[in-house]
Amino acid sequence: MKDINVGRIVMARFVRSLLLLTGLCACSFAYAVEPGVNNPLLSELRPWCIGRLMFDRPVSSEISDERYEYRGEKLVTTHDVSAEDYDAKVAAREKELRTKQRVNPVDLQEQTGRMSLEKAFSPVPHSRVFVFNDAVAKAVALPFDTEGYLFANRTLVRTTSLIGADVLDRAESIYDDTYRRIKVRDNWAVPTESGFCFDGGVVAGPSTYSEEVSQSFALMPGRPALLVIKLRDAVDVDLEQPLTRNLRALRATLNRMPGRYSILRQGKRQVAGMDAEEVLFALRDGAVTVYRFYLLAPGNPATVEQPHTSVELLLGAPARDDLPPEKATSPVDEAGALQVWDTLLNSLRARPGAI
């Protein structure tokens, strides 16, 4: 009975907040944003590509963390690399793998006489892929590590993954296909062709393989203001895991923070043409106000245009010795926090031509 009463209270707060904060009818899935409001987190916006979606990113923001996977390959980009540094790095790595011996995990003292490197090849000019194994076993066929490098326009893309022994003979064709798709680009240049955007590049072409991306943006470097966007292929089971199932865990996290929290808004909305759920928390502890906004869209397994999408906006943090209250509190008030959230979510959309 207590849970039922709590649910009624939460729903009542949600309805009141919906009417007071947005002025929209209860059936609407989008939230209007008041134009012309001076918000330091939204001073200038530019189109930004993320996976096969895009949104209007604040120019003053900085990426604090990022991760990309395509076809099971982790993609890591290093910028401003010279051709000489690329050649030296690849040559040193190949020499290391040709010199190093595989070990027997059962008898580490055994001299197996087999070098770690199994294969080395160049799918495209200025690239090198290594297939190797640090161990050898007589009873089972161990998977191989793969490590690849692609260099263009002072940009170095490194790929890492695993490949089964049963597809070892197809390694060249697999990497020929993937590496020929990779094109380097300026990060602010949004491609018009189909493809998957990652740091400094795009894997061109329609999607036939798994794709995953995570980017964290420091909206005001030096202050606790973080936007986190995570995209991956949608699967059928995602439809059974709505955001409401995670409310208990979210509440538990907030309960471990000082102060008292309240729900500003909770319910369904649209994002990038997909059905989604959101829950927006505010936590106040004296002079410190913290906002924790969450959105989850399960996506559509039938199309990569609607990936499983998770968005978090984290404004403010509990005060501590090295973070006084005036620096720990959210850099914007409640109206400003809602404006940031709705502006960025409303701008998240499928990139034209991405599919």
Regions found by a protein language model. Name each.
Residues 64-112, 158-163, 213-250, 278, ...:
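A short acidic-to-branched-hydrophobic micro-motif
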Residues 62, 66-199:
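Long, acidic/polar, low-complexity amphipathic helices and coiled-coil-like
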